[in-house]
């Protein structure tokens, strides 16, 4: 009898071409790597449903995915079964059997991302794949002031990668926290959903505010323009982490 199993996954996206598997099977992705592990453990071909399509180089602290299986492996034991076949940069933190109708993507009601910045004159070779280096001191208060303009429901067309054919570019950001501890700055962004590159462009724009290249109130003008060219840079993928997903 078919069952539905949910996974909670942590991964280092450095050596992967994002989450989503590609037609070219030689391209390494997180999804294809976990599917291979499931097939090794169950001897079944499965389709792994992901909660979000993270880009190449983006990391995840608590990614949710699910798959249907006829395997008799108990739900809570799948994490052990799969971790045996996974590389060291992917780990299943939790596994459990869930109702058949559960869908990792469609049932997700909110997400939190965190963008990490190393704010000091010298970069860190050890952290180079996990944090974005900004050598000049950031004005955190200005960044916090700018972030307030992003809270709420807006058309975020200016904060997405150009192109695409979406029904709507309206999204709701529920909270942005900008924290600094020693030389580490973190931008935590929570919302009901995000457009392609949205969190990276928001982070890049807030960094430009922190470097006094823009004023905090410029954010309002950028939103109203709905023009990608008006917003700031798309911050590098290596600093971005999918931190948390929310379900009813």
UniProtKB/Swiss-Prot annotation:
Its EC number is 5.4.99.12. Disulfide bonds: none annotated. One of its GO terms (molecular function) is tRNA pseudouridine(38-40) synthase activity. The active site is at 55 (nucleophile). It catalyses: uridine(38/39/40) in tRNA = pseudouridine(38/39/40) in tRNA. Substrate binds at residue 113. Keywords: Isomerase, tRNA processing. InterPro entries: PsdUridine_synth_cat_dom_sf (IPR020103), PsdUridine_synth_TruA (IPR001406), PsdUridine_synth_TruA_a/b_dom (IPR020097), PsdUridine_synth_TruA_C (IPR020095), TruA/RsuA/RluB/E/F_N (IPR020094). One of its GO terms (biological process) is tRNA pseudouridine synthesis. It comes from the Bacteria. Formation of pseudouridine at positions 38, 39 and 40 in the anticodon stem and loop of transfer RNAs. Homodimer. Belongs to the tRNA pseudouridine synthase TruA family. PANTHER family: PSEUDOURIDYLATE SYNTHASE (PTHR11142), TRNA PSEUDOURIDINE SYNTHASE-LIKE 1 (PTHR11142:SF0). This is tRNA pseudouridine synthase A 2. It comes from Clostridium tetani (strain Massachusetts / E88). The lineage of its organism: Bacteria, Bacillati, Bacillota, Clostridia, Eubacteriales.
């Amino acid at each position: 009898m078919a069952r539905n199993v949910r996974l909670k996954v942590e991964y280092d996206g450095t050596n992967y071409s994002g989450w989503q598997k590609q037609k070219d099977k030689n391209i390494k992705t997180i999804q294809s790597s976990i599917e291979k592990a499931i097939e090794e453990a169950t001897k079944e071909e499965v389709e792994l449903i992901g909660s979000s399509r993270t880009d190449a180089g983006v990391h995840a602290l608590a990614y949710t995915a699910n798959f249907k299986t006829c395997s008799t492996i108990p739900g809570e034991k799948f994490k052990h079964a799969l971790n045996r076949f996974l590389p060291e940069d992917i780990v299943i933190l939790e596994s459990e059997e869930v109702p058949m109708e559960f869908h990792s993507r469609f049932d997700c009601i909110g997400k939190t991302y965190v963008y990490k910045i190393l704010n000091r004159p010298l970069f860190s070779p050890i952290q180079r794949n996990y944090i974005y280096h900004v050598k000049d001191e950031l004005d955190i208060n200005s960044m916090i002031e700018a972030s307030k303009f992003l809270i709420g429901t807006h058309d975020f067309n200016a904060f997405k990668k150009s192109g695409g054919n979406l029904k709507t570019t309206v999204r709701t950001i529920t909270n942005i926290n900008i924290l600094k501890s020693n030389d580490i700055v973190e931008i935590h962004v929570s919302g009901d959903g995000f457009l392609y590159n949205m969190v990276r462009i928001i982070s890049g724009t807030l960094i430009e505010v922190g470097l006094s290249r823009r004023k905090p109130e410029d954010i309002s003008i950028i939103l109203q323009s709905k023009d990608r060219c008006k917003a700031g840079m798309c911050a590098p993928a290596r600093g971005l982490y999918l931190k948390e997903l929310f379900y009813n």
